[in-house]
Each structure stands twice: as structure tokens, then as C-alpha cells.
């Protein structure tokens, strides 16, 4: 916990990080990705799903695979897959109070779009707490965990890696941040699979089941 005393920039992934995975928002995105690929490539649903997961594994995002393998332009894909129902989310006053209490500035770093991040943050009642969003468009469609975009994220936010913490639900997105000197936090409920695959503990400074649990611990440490 001691490293958090020097943090003045708090960087959060979005989906399944700022809200629990049980809300199944990303399940909606997942289904729409399959439907988009099925239509765009004229393949069966089963083949579309296989390609979707293969590209996620091999390229970091399904979109990156479609762009590299099929020369697909990103806008139609992004608009389609993020056209989801976020009404299942509701304002989270406890989360808001915790994020607001963190000393310094707060940011969102997502492989989704800025519009999607803003919609989700507004539903949670926390959108006004964030100073900036680094999305897939900001990254020129290069996704986490590609190491080249992490310095770009730091530069856009105007923050120092050694004074920044990064909260993420996919372990494979943490090593590039840790290599730059960011304090890394992996958020995952026990017995929940990490679809990005495991990474060594040397890349993860802290583990927690969810964002509110770790923020409570951080604020207790800072207040002590």
C-alpha cells in the first residue's frame, strides 16, 4: 500500500473494472461482435465466433484482427458493437465518493470508444470525475496490451508513470504499464477466468476482487 502515497494520477480501465462483470454489458458487446462478423464476412455464427476469439487472442482486440486480416475500416464495427443497452447500470454513490476522494486526477484507458466510456460513466454517476479518456481511436486503433500505446496514453494525460496507478480486469494489459513504472492493480473475483491469459505476479502490484474493495483499502491507508 505504501506506493499509493506517491500516486497523483489514477487510471482506470472501463468495462468490468468500473462496474462488476455481473452486469453483463460486455456480453452484449460480445454478441454484437459475432453478429457483425457473421454479416460482414458471410460466415456461419460458429465461424464468426471462432474468428472473434482468435483475433482477440492474437491481436489484442477483435477489431485489430479484422483490420489486419480483412482490411476492415473501424468506424462501422465500433458503432455497431457499442450500440448496447446500459440501462442495467445505475448510479453508484459509494464508488463516486471513493473515486472523488482519491488525491489527484482520474482517467479512463479503454479499448472501447470514448462515447461508450462516457455513456457508462454517466450511468454510474461518475463521468464528471474523470479528466480525460484515452480510447481505441486515441490509440490509432492499436489496443492494449500493445506496449507502444502506453507512453502515448501517459503523454495525452500529461502524467508520470511512477506517480500513476492503473486498475484493470485483464492481467495481460498490466505488464506494459508495470514496465513503465506504473503501480498496477488486477481486479478479478475469485475463480473468475482471465480470458486474456495469466501473467507473472511480478507485473501485478496488488490484487483485489473489485474496484471498490481496493479503493477502500487505498483510502484507509492514505487516511491513516
Listing of model-derived features with the role each one plays in the protein:
Residues 1-7, 100, 113-114, 118-224:
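Asp-based, Mg2+/Mn2+-dependent phosphohydrolase catalytic module
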Residues 3-12, 17-96, 115:
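N-terminal helical cap/lid subdomain that shapes the substrate entry/recognition surface
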Residues 20, 108-110, 186:
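Hydrophobic residues in well-ordered beta-strands that form the structural core
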Residues 45, 101-105, 161:
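Short, surface-exposed connector motifs at secondary-structure boundaries
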Residues 91, 109, 142:
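Residue-level marker of regulatory loop/turn positions in helix-turn-helix DNA-binding domains and
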Amino acid at each position: 500500500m505504501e506506493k499509493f502515497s506517491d500516486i497523483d494520477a489514477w487510471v482506470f480501465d472501463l468495462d468490468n473494472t468500473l462496474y462488476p462483470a455481473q452486469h453483463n454489458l460486455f456480453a452484449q458487446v460480445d454478441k454484437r461482435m459475432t453478429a457483425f462478423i457473421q454479416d460482414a464476412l458471410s460466415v456461419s455464427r460458429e465461424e464468426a465466433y471462432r474468428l472473434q476469439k482468435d483475433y482477440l487472442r492474437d491481436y489484442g482486440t477483435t477489431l485489430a484482427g479484422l483490420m489486419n486480416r480483412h482490411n476492415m475500416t473501424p468506424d462501422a464495427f465500433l458503432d455497431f458493437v457499442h450500440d448496447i443497452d446500459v440501462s442495467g447500470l445505475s448510479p453508484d454513490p459509494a464508488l463516486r465518493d471513493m473515486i472523488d476522494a482519491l488525491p489527484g486526477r482520474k482517467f479512463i484507458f479503454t479499448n472501447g470508444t470514448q462515447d461508450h466510456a462516457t455513456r457508462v460513466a454517466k450511468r454510474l454517476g461518475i463521468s464528471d470525475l474523470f479528466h480525460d479518456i484515452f480510447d481505441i481511436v486515441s490509440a490509432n486503433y492499436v489496443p492494449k496490451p500493445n506496449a507502444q500505446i502506453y507512453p502515448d496514453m501517459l503523454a495525452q494525460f500529461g502524467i508520470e508513470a511512477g506517480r500513476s496507478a492503473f486498475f484493470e480486469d485483464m492481467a495481460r494489459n498490466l505488464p506494459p504499464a508495470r514496465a513503465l513504472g506504473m503501480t498496477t492493480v488486477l481486479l478479478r473475483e475469485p475463480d473468475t477466468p482471465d480470458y486474456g491469459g495469466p501473467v507473472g505476479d511480478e507485473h501485478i502490484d496488488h490484487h483485489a476482487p473489485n474496484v471498490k474493495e481496493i479503493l477502500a483499502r487505498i483510502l484507509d491507508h492514505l487516511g491513516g
